[in-house]
From Swiss-Prot:
This is Tetraacyldisaccharide 4'-kinase. GO terms for molecular function: ATP binding; tetraacyldisaccharide 4'-kinase activity. One of its GO terms (cellular component) is plasma membrane. It comes from Bordetella parapertussis (strain 12822 / ATCC BAA-587 / NCTC 13253). Pathway: Glycolipid biosynthesis; lipid IV(A) biosynthesis; lipid IV(A) from (3R)-3-hydroxytetradecanoyl-[acyl-carrier-protein] and UDP-N-acetyl-alpha-D-glucosamine: step 6/6. Transfers the gamma-phosphate of ATP to the 4'-position of a tetraacyldisaccharide 1-phosphate intermediate (termed DS-1-P) to form tetraacyldisaccharide 1,4'-bis-phosphate (lipid IVA). PANTHER family: TETRAACYLDISACCHARIDE 4'-KINASE, TETRAACYLDISACCHARIDE 4'-KINASE, MITOCHONDRIAL-RELATED. InterPro entries: LpxK (IPR003758), P-loop_NTPase (IPR027417). The gene is lpxK. It catalyses: a lipid A disaccharide + ATP = a lipid IVA + ADP + H(+). The keyword Cell wall biogenesis/degradation does not apply.
C-alpha cells in the first residue's frame, strides 16, 4: 500500500475517533474556524450581500467533508416537489468539469463529461433542468433564463455557498455524524458542529430502515434515509435482472465496484439485499473510467452504481450491470412539510 493511501486512512480514522495526528493539526483547524466564521458573519451582518432568486431555493449539503449521500437526497427532494405540483430546477458546481465563464444548462440524458457525475445522474433520474457553474447565483440566473417555468431551485452541495440566499437548508449526514467534532484538517468538518442547529432539516443516511425522530420545537426536522435496490440494468443494452436473480448467483461469479464518496456503503447495500459479491473494487470518487479497471476481475457480472454506469457505458463491457435504487425516508410527511415551508416563506 502506498504512503499517501496509508496517511489518508490514518487521517480518516482520526477524523472519527481523534488521536495524535488530529491533535497535532488543531492549530490549522483553528485557522479554518476563523475563515469560516468570518465569511459567515459577513453574510449574516450584511457586509456581503447574498443574491436572492425570484423563486424559492432549497439547499442540500453537508458539513462532513466527502460523501454522505447528498445526491440521493437531492433526487428525492426534486421528486417530492414534483409530486406536489412544483417545477424544480437544480444547480450544481459541476465537479471535475471545466464549465468556463458561462453556466452550462441542460436537461435529460446529460453527459457526465460535460456536466459532472452528480448533475448528469440527477438530470437522468428526475428529468429536471440542470445548470452547472461554481458561482451558484450565476447558475440560478442561467437556469431561470433557459427554463422560465422553474418555480423552485434545489442547490446541490450548496450549504457553504452563502452568496446564494436560501429558504430551506437540508443537511445530509451518515452514521459518522460529526466524527471527532473538529474542523478540517484536524477533523472532517467544513463548519462547526453547532451549524446543525441553524438548518431546517437533518437527513441521516442510515444505510438501513430506521424510525423518524420525534420533532422538537425549534429544532431541525430529523429523519433517516436509506437506499433500497430495486433491480439491475445492463449498461450496454438496458436488459434487466431482479435482485432475487442476482442473490441466487454464486458469489464467485459476482463482483462489485464503486467510484463514489463512500464505496463501502454501496457494498453494504448489496449485502443487505442478499447479494454478496466475491470481489469488490473501491475506486476514487469521480473516477473517470478513461481505461477499464475491470480487466483483471474474474467475474461474469460486475455490479456498479448508477452514477458510475453513466461513465462506464463507453467501456462497452457486457458484464457491467447498474444497480438501480430507490430512496426511502423515515418521515412520510417530509414532502408535505417541505412544500408547505416553501409556500410559507414565499413573499
Amino acid at each position: 500500500m502506498n504512503a499517501p493511501r496509508c496517511l489518508r486512512r490514518l487521517l480518516e480514522r482520526q477524523w472519527r475517533q481523534g488521536g495524535w495526528l488530529s491533535t497535532l493539526l488543531r492549530p490549522l483547524a483553528a485557522l479554518t474556524g476563523l475563515v469560516v466564521a468570518r465569511k459567515r458573519n459577513a453574510y449574516l451582518t450584511g457586509a456581503r450581500a447574498a443574491w436572492r432568486a425570484p423563486v424559492p431555493v432549497v439547499v442540500v449539503g453537508n458539513i462532513y467533508v466527502g460523501g454522505t449521500g447528498k445526491t440521493p437526497v437531492v433526487i428525492e427532494v426534486v421528486r417530492q416537489l414534483q409530486a406536489r405540483g412544483w417545477t424544480p430546477g437544480v444547480v450544481s458546481r459541476g465537479y471535475g468539469v471545466d464549465v468556463g465563464a458561462a453556466p452550462r444548462v441542460g436537461q435529460g440524458q446529460l453527459a457526465a463529461a460535460d456536466y459532472g457525475d452528480e448533475p448528469a445522474l440527477i438530470a437522468r433520474a428526475t428529468g429536471a433542468a440542470i445548470a452547472v457553474h461554481p458561482h451558484r447565483p450565476r447558475a440560478v440566473q442561467a437556469l431561470l433564463r433557459a427554463h422560465p417555468g422553474v418555480d423552485v431551485v434545489v442547490s446541490d452541495d450548496g450549504l457553504q455557498h452563502l452568496a446564494l440566499a436560501r429558504d430551506v437548508e437540508i443537511v445530509v449526514q451518515d452514521e459518522r455524524g460529526v466524527g471527532n467534532g473538529r474542523l478540517l484538517p484536524a477533523g472532517p468538518l467544513r463548519e462547526p458542529a453547532q451549524r446543525l442547529a441553524d438548518v431546517d432539516a437533518i437527513v441521516t443516511n442510515a444505510g438501513r430502515p430506521r424510525a423518524a425522530a420525534a420533532p422538537a420545537a425549534g429544532a431541525p426536522r430529523q429523519l433517516a434515509m436509506w437506499l433500497e435496490p430495486t433491480h439491475a440494468q445492463r449498461v450496454t443494452d438496458g436488459a434487466t435482472r431482479t435482485l432475487a436473480d442476482l442473490a441466487a448467483l454464486p458469489p464467485a461469479r459476482l463482483a462489485a465496484a464503486a467510484g463514489i464518496g463512500n464505496p463501502a456503503r454501496f457494498f453494504q447495500t448489496l449485502e443487505q439485499a442478499g447479494i454478496r459479491p466475491a470481489h469488490t473494487l473501491a475506486l476514487p470518487d469521480h473516477y473517470a473510467y478513461a481505461q477499464s479497471p475491470f480487466t483483471a476481475l474474474d467475474a461474469d457480472l460486475i455490479l456498479v452504481t448508477a452514477k458510475d454506469a453513466i461513465k462506464c457505458a463507453a467501456l462497452d463491457d457486457p458484464r457491467l450491470w447498474a444497480v438501480q435504487v430507490g430512496t426511502r425516508l423515515s418521515d412520510p410527511d417530509f414532502g408535505d412539510w417541505l412544500s408547505a415551508t416553501l409556500r410559507a416563506r414565499q413573499p
